[in-house]
Amino acid sequence: MAKLTKDELIEAFKEMTLIELSEFVKEFEEVFDVTAAAPVAAVAAAPGAEGGAAAEEKDEFDVVLEDAGAKKIGVIKVVREIVSGLGLKEAKELVEGAPKAILEGASKDDAEAAKTKLEEAGAKVSLK
């Protein structure tokens, strides 16, 4: 098997959907017995590191779909609006797999707008 360069891997990842990337990460974690989560010590040290900096507002948010509610079809439509390039099948799998992150690293305005749209469609959503 030919060895792929970093650039070739990045290009391959660019062509994958959000769900395909999520499945890849899960399989990668299982095969290599690692986790993609940030170390707890690094996360715990950050808030106390600069006293006043902890009071600053977060500028990146994850929009997490906690539950689709009774109106799944409406929620699926909104998910397709929010996540560009997502097909009907992928959006359905994402909604049915709740709780799942819909957007990651979104600005406050984008995260709030997505949360509002999803809640109007009947979903339970949280920002992290």
Curated annotation (Swiss-Prot):
One of its GO terms (cellular component) is cytosolic large ribosomal subunit. One of its GO terms (biological process) is translation. Pfam families: Ribosomal_L12, Ribosomal_L12_N. The keyword NAD does not apply. Belongs to the bacterial ribosomal protein bL12 family. Forms part of the ribosomal stalk which helps the ribosome interact with GTP-bound translation factors. Is thus essential for accurate translation. PANTHER family: 39S RIBOSOMAL PROTEIN L12 (PTHR45987), LARGE RIBOSOMAL SUBUNIT PROTEIN BL12M (PTHR45987:SF4). This is Large ribosomal subunit protein bL12. The gene is rplL.
